[in-house]
């Protein structure tokens, strides 16, 4: 499958490491034990305004299809088994990743697999959903009306760039649509408290500038401040240089030529999506231009590989605890406490 630049930067099709939940392949989904209809319906109907339109959910949904690349994590975290989920990253045709496997197993979730490359209205309709979730998705002005005609559709959030809504917004939007706002708030609060604890324990990171970058075969890229991957570091006290937003415009990333490598000259450089870099980490470390960066020479570079790269790409309420476990020690080595 040929990847567009956007799909590559989103992280599609990387064969990152990690065990996956057995049995989560294509086929009919099951909502057994996980339908949102098992909760009280007093809060319905629910109306949610999005960037592309308004979704009115008349009653607690029982068959939820996820067309967002990562939205099924929030659905699972809130105790609902999606009947369909979008493939994005990792082992091919696997939509439940290691950090979500326990939640999926508890719900007996076996979602039908929707392809990464495009929205598939026929496959969505075949699952007979009464709610479609596509917060972190490629829903747009052309395909949103088609999908929303199948079932009420919660699309990209208002007030954010494409693919820019943070995990908190994603979790709370899904919680509202499922009638589980209290549970969504609880999940968000617990994870935010963990970020705060790490931030408080590492005051040396406050105000330090970070570049979250990738190295492709022909160019470099850096994520803008609204991208969830950059938000991960700002949640820990780091700052994304305003220059990156200028370069990115309305996109979630800015593409740089190799000659622009000095744009990455900041306190911390984080190398992401190394599974797409020909030769991986070694290529970055040996690059004659990138190796000139002070952060590279002085040990202030962090490399996200394997299962960590995979979890970091997701940026969800379920994946982020694993990311914190893996990345915080590396950050403490790169910029240690005085």
Question: What feature does the model see in each segment?
Answer:
Residues 24-36:
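Bacterial lipoprotein signal-peptidase II cleavage site
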Residues 264-338:
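Structured C-terminal subdomain patch of bacterial secreted/periplasmic proteins
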Residues 128-134, 152, 266:
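Proline-aspartate-enriched helix->loop->beta-strand connector
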Residues 54, 150-217, 313-338:
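Extracytoplasmic substrate-binding proteins
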Residues 72-123:
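A short, structured surface patch at a secondary-structure boundary
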Residues 63-78, 183-242:
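Basic- and aromatic-lined ligand-binding clefts that recognize polyanionic substrates
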Residues 89-95, 139-142, 157-173, 207-232, ...:
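Extracytoplasmic ligand-binding site segments that recognize negatively charged/polar headgroups
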Residues 7-26:
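N-terminal export signals
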